[in-house]
């Protein structure tokens, strides 16, 4: 359920899909070059799969999101530097929430070690 073509939103008709990359210069905690390269390959792979479905798609840096214009819809980034960047730069997006995330959030209140006890229940719910 993590790739676009099998997500909750696969039947939505989007005009264009932007895949957002967050390079080290935008991060407060720098990632290793191996991690940056791995993430870049994941994004390029997703771009190709979307284009294979004849959907217009472009990879952009997170700093370019503010230049897209209004009426932007995005998967909710939950936590981390992407959400922090959007908030710090006052970038307003209309978020889409995956059913998997919405269901799982109820178990996200006492850290990972408590959450992991619910993983089998979450998997059962979505398989």
What are the residue ranges of the model-derived segments?
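Trp/Phe/Arg-rich N-terminal binding region typifying the photolyase-homology
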Residues: 1-127
